[in-house]
Amino acid sequence: MSSVQNKVETLVELFPDWKREDLLELVQEEKDTELEIIVEKITTGKVTKWDEVKKPKRERHAPEASSVRTYSSSTHSHSAASGGAAAPRYKKSGRFAGNSGVSNTATGSSTSTSSGTSTSASSHGAAQSASSGKNATAAAQAAVKKTGVPAGTKEEKIAQRLNSTHTQEERKKMSWAAIATPKPKPKPVQKKKEEEPAQESQEDTKASESSKESALENVEDLKNEVDNIEKEQEKKEEPAQETEKETVEKEQEPQPQPQEQEQPQEQAQEQAANEQQQQEQQQPQQPQQEQQEQQLAQEAAAPAEAAPASKQGSVSEAAQQQQQQQQQQTAPQQTAQQQQPAQQLTDAQLQAQAQAQAQAQAQAQQYYMYQNQFPGYSYPGMYDMQGYAYGQQYQQPTPMGGHPAMVNAQFSMQQGYMNAGTPVSAGVDLNTATAAPNTAQSPVAPHTQQQSQQQPYGAGSFMPYYAHFYQQYPYGQPQYGVAANQYPYQTTKSSGQNLYGGEYGQQAQQDAQAKGVQRNDSHSEQQTSDSAQQQLTPQQIQLQQYYQYQQQQQQQQQQQQQQAPQQQQQPNAQQYGYSGYDYNTKSTNGFY
């Protein structure tokens, strides 16, 4: 044990940043090895503290480890004498620091510097092997054995030698900061477009700084090379720069035009949408419309990127005002048009109108989607819940005549804002944007005519893009009314009966088609009414096939339900979760 204690004591003096426990474990693990070998392992980094991360990049110093063995003690005992820069990294015991001739404040306390201390110590030892020689080892071994102080003159000589080796080593070995900073050579080549006199002065200063910092011997050769390269490239680039300037000037000139044309673009889009309706009434307006169509073509050709974001905001405000005025103007025209039944549009005119509106919408889509949003509400996370904005609007009673309410699941959402007559007060003109193509196709058109007194959902809406999004998606959209099972979660059909007694419950049953006979009847009703009204869109055909497929499954479910007592199932169905999720609902809230 005494030998182990002696080894630990000497190692503690040699490596004050190691804990005694770590050194004790190390010595006990390697009982048979000599002290010098343990010291060498620590200095080369083969052995580290238990909580230390190995840095394998330092292994390039491994071939020099044989020369480190004899100097390992000297590197650590004299590391604080090697100048102020290296002192905080390699601490040593306080008595050496106090007695050394160089003014250094090194504490004996163990520092938390990780393997940088031990591994870089090995590199120091390797660098010192050529210069410091045997005097350093002799002095260090004497200091370790006697724990006395050798003569001050020797230590001063050693300190001078160590300082000289450090300066040499700093020239060879760059620090991390020096490695990370970009080298000064390519910089003047990149900045060749700047003015020449300022550039030359900058190069002189940079070259002088670099000669001071990194001690380059060939700075002037570098300067000459860089000057030659620059002259060649400037000769090449002078014509190129002139052409660049010309193109830049040409690009800068048409920039004010699209900004001025944005406002007529709004008018042109709306005019293109209302044009087919207004042609029969207002023939004297045709020259204006032709002018605005020309402006539309110019706008499509002009670069859309030109207007900066700040001006687009003001343009969108002006565009909103213009839209409101124009809608107020077009509303009496539309009512006049409704009063004259002789002027009803034929199918060909409807198709032409739909095409014109589709073109206008395609051009306006980017503008409508983004610039008109109210800035505070433009983030999409608020609308993750489908039923979010519908509680704020008063609920519309579902039309329940002899006609099943949810005949067209993909159009029922749009009934709220497909009204042709009502002016929209928000920045987006939903009628001209998307309404007419859908009404042209949709069999719900008579219903939208009936409900045209209701204010559309898009009016006063702070997210116009929300309405566009839902109009273009054919999936199950939220419908209106509690009877039609409108909750953000999925409820069961029985909840409609239990919430409302009497007539309303029966209507809810009939709408949701919860019972077998009613389901079959209303399903056949749906098919006949759909085929009678108009040709089906492919989405509706898909829906009908889907419902027919569901009906087979529902009949099987029905047989099972008739066998089991229904009274037990109803309280379970009351619970909110998906336990009572049934596929026979015609108003599924989720995406199916």
Curated annotation (Swiss-Prot):
Residues 3-47 form the CUE domain. It comes from the Eukaryota. Residues 53-343, 438-457, 494-537, 552-592 are annotated as: Disordered. GO terms for biological process: positive regulation of transcription initiation by RNA polymerase II; protein ubiquitination; regulation of protein complex stability; telomere maintenance; transcription-coupled nucleotide-excision repair; ubiquitin-dependent protein catabolic process. Residues 65-88, 100-146, 258-309, 318-343, 552-575 have a biased composition (Low complexity). GO terms for cellular component: chromatin; chromosome, telomeric region; cytoplasm; nucleus. Residues 203-253 have a biased composition (Basic and acidic residues). It is found in: Cytoplasm; Nucleus; Chromosome, Telomere. Keywords: Chromosome, Cytoplasm, DNA damage, DNA repair, DNA-binding, Nucleus, Telomere, Ubl conjugation, Ubl conjugation pathway. InterPro entries: DEF1_CUE. Ubiquitinated. Residues 582-592 have a biased composition (Polar residues). One of its GO terms (molecular function) is ubiquitin binding. Belongs to the DEF1 family. Recruits the ubiquitination machinery to RNA polymerase II for polyubiquitination, removal and degradation, when the transcription-coupled repair (TCR) factor RAD26 fails to efficiently displace stalled RNA polymerase II. Also involved in telomere length regulation. Binds DNA. Homodimer; may form higher order oligomers. Interacts with the large RNA polymerase II subunit RPO21; the interaction is direct and serves to bridge RPO21 to the Elongin complex in a manner dependent on transcription stress. Interacts with RAD26. This is RNA polymerase II degradation factor 1. It comes from Candida glabrata (strain ATCC 2001 / BCRC 20586 / JCM 3761 / NBRC 0622 / NRRL Y-65 / CBS 138). The lineage of its organism: Eukaryota, Fungi, Dikarya, Ascomycota, Saccharomycotina. The gene is DEF1.
